[in-house]
C-alpha cells in the first residue's frame, strides 16, 4: 500500500521491507517551497480482514472533513478553491501560458495549505497570475461549475473574491500574533465573525468558573459571531455548523463501531459520535478519557477538533484525523526502552534535585499511519499529544494504571531522492 503525502512517512517493519521501500521513487512533485513525497504503509497486508475493514471505515470518516478545515482557515477559502478548480478543469484557452502555469502553482499551494495562506508562516500567497487573466478565465468556464451564491452573477463573484486574492492588504495573515494589535480582527482565520478580541475574551471569561477543577475547553468546537448585536456561538455539530460533513463522518464511524476490536474501542467510537451529534464539551472530555484508557486496540485513530494553533486566542480547534495501526515489532523495541525509564531517569546527566525518585505512567507504542486528513494533511505532524485538557492529564498522573504515552505517529523521514533518513520515535510521557 503506497499513499501520497507531503513530507513524512509512516514507520516501517523489518529490514527487508525497508530495503524494498528504498527502491521506490518517493518524490511526486516539487513547486514553490514544497516537495510532495509518497510513503509506504507497511504491515497493512498483515492485518486481519476485520481490522482492514475497520481501517477502511475510519479512513472514509477521515476523508469527509476536508472542507471543514478549508473553511476554518478562511472565510473565502472554499469559494476561491472551487473557482480555481473550475478554471483548472474547464478552461478552454491556452494552458501553456505563464498566467495559467502560475495559476496552477497557486492552486496547488491552496490545496497543500488548505487555504490561501501558508501552512506554516500563515502569510497570504502572492498570485503569479494577473487579475485580468483570471477574470477572463472565470468568465469563460461553465457558470454551473462556479461557486455562485443564489442570484449571484459571475461578475459579482469576481468583485467579491478578487480583493481577497490579489490585494495584499486584505486578510494578509491567517493567524496574527503581533503585540498591540487586535488579534481577532487582524487574523484571517474563520473562528470569529463580527467580534473583537476583547469581546471574545470577555465572552469566554464570563463562562469560566475558577473553582471548577474539571473545566471544559470553552470555545473548542464553535465559531463566535455577533448577529443583531448579540454575541453567540455557532457550534460545530450534526444539525449545526459543518453539520453536513459531520453527519457523513458519523455515518462512517457507525460502521466502524460495528467492527471495533475491543469493547473499549467501541465505547470510544460511540462517545465520539455522541459528541459530534450534541456538540457537548463534557461529552468530548468523556471521549478523551475513554480514548486515553484504550491501550489494547491495535487500530487507533483521531478524528475531531483537536489543536488550537490556528486560533490567535488559542481556544478554537481545527479539524483533523489520523488512522493508524500498531507496528508490533517496533513497539516491542520501544517498550524495552520505556520499561527501563527508571534507569534512564537515575542516570540522566542532571542535578539530583530534579530527578524523580519513582517514574510512573510510562508506556509507548510505534504506529504506522494509514491516512492523515484535515490539519494533519498534507503537511504532517510527527506526533499528536492528547488530551489537551490539563485536568485530564493530571488524572493520568494520579492513577498510574491510566498513565499512557500519547504517541501517535512515528515517521521515516525521506530525502528528496527517496532514501530513508531516520526512524523517529515521538513520545509524550505522563510521569
Model-identified regions with their sequence ranges:
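Contiguous, non-catalytic segments that form substrate-binding/exosite surfaces or channel walls
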Residues: 107, 111-428
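C-terminal motif of bacterial Sec signal peptides marking the signal peptidase cleavage site
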Residues: 6-10
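Bacterial signal peptide processing site
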Residues: 12-15
